[in-house]
Amino acid sequence: MKDSIVLYSALGRGHLVSMVELGKLILSHHPSLSITILFLTPPPNQDTPTSPTAFTCDATAKYIAAVTAATPSITFHRIPQISIPTVLPPMALTFELCRATGHHLRRILTSISQTSNLKAIVLDFMNYSAARVTNTLQIPTYFYYTSGASTLAVLFQQIIIHQNNTKSIKDLNMHLLIPGLPKIHTDDMPEQVQDRENEGYEVFIDIATCMRDSDGVIVNTFEAMEGRVMEAFNEGLMEGPTPPLFCIGPVISSAPCRVDDDGCLSWLDSQPSHSVVFLSFGSMGRFSRTQLREIAIGLEKSEQRFLWVVRSEFEEGDSVEPPSLDELLPEGFLERTKGKGMVLRDWAPQAAILSHDSVGGFVTHCGWNSVLEAVCEGVPMVAWPLYAEQKLNKVILVEEMKVGLAVKQNKDGLVSSTELGDRVRELMDSDRGKEIRQKIFKMKMSANEAMAKGGSSIMALNRLVEVWREH
């Protein structure tokens, strides 16, 4: 029987794509393995096109068909859809769906074990509750952590903080000292772990504990990018036990989308090399009209060329139809900046834009996939974190890696036009900006080396597969 590995994706298209890319990477170096990807779909009453967990059947079926045709050694297995009567927020739905389908997971894994040598299962870290099933079945259990090693170190440290304190993190008002990392203020910890009374707090303690107690964690980073913290892990300097780590990144989409329906790539073709700053904040990065206007004024003040993806919050009084750009932005802004800037609604081919020679800077929400895309293309960043672990990523990018600048927010979370304009100008047109550009160019070279034959990430992948075959 063939040796097989199961990858279990969390709910949502982005999570599925991450697992597919991991599967493709494994097979490109170890084609004798068979890979099965398990995926979840939302309950019928909670699959809306605008939901962050949206998983429309047609789009998913087309994506899976394309992957299967290109990579026959990857097979897909959908966890049967179940009903959850209570409408839950996206993150809570993700956790609950995995927990509530444990009996289906047990049946599927038992079936796979009867037709192949099931060597290991890799869980998306959001599917942490599946470890209870896999441990009962005595299947070696690994986690795929799609962020970096630095935030993983902070996640493990959260267990120690929980054990040693009765206060919530938000009340500590202190800097955390974690081996291999710069000082991290408690204000920069993820919102979900700030407050012990937050319903997500215990979940993240459980996630950290399950990952720490697993057979290993696969991390989407590379040694040269997070060298100090990886050295701390490898030398056993972390407080408390840690599992084996395998840094196999950067794993990002292997084929940048070249769709140019809005003409942005053609527009970039007409701009000077490294002259355009790109602003995009992820699928959940929506701003109030007040903030959008501050961004617009700041870009105009900066006098830099720009390509900006605008996503607006739904505000009371808005009609079903989204407001036009003219309604959202300052009067005359589009006309005044049409020679220097381009504004898009809701979406842009980010990977293709970042790889374009005209792009010289990236204002980002610091989502890890976006960070990796920027690093792989050597594009320096302005860090504007919005949610999840993004404040931690900002600290690492700015204080540790020194490949970006951070914007300052006021007490209401607003970034002023002056602040944004100054940071954009500093990144694009200053000596400090040049230093940052040189640093991230070196990091780009290191990323290429890590994924080349004999590189650190490929060697880590080979070690991982050796361990799997020994199970």
From Swiss-Prot:
An anthocyanidin binds at residues 15, 388. One of its GO terms (molecular function) is isoflavone 7-O-glucosyltransferase activity. It is an enzyme of class 2 (transferase). Expressed in roots. Detected in stems and leaves. It comes from Pueraria montana var. lobata (Kudzu vine). This is UDP-glycosyltransferase 1. Its EC number is 2.4.1.170. Keywords: Glycosyltransferase, Transferase. Pfam families: UDPGT. Induction: Up-regulated by methyl jasmonate. InterPro entries: UDP-glycosyltransf_plant, UDP_glucos_trans, UDP_glycos_trans_CS. UDP-alpha-D-glucose binds at residues 146, 348, 350, 365, 368-370, 373, 389-390.
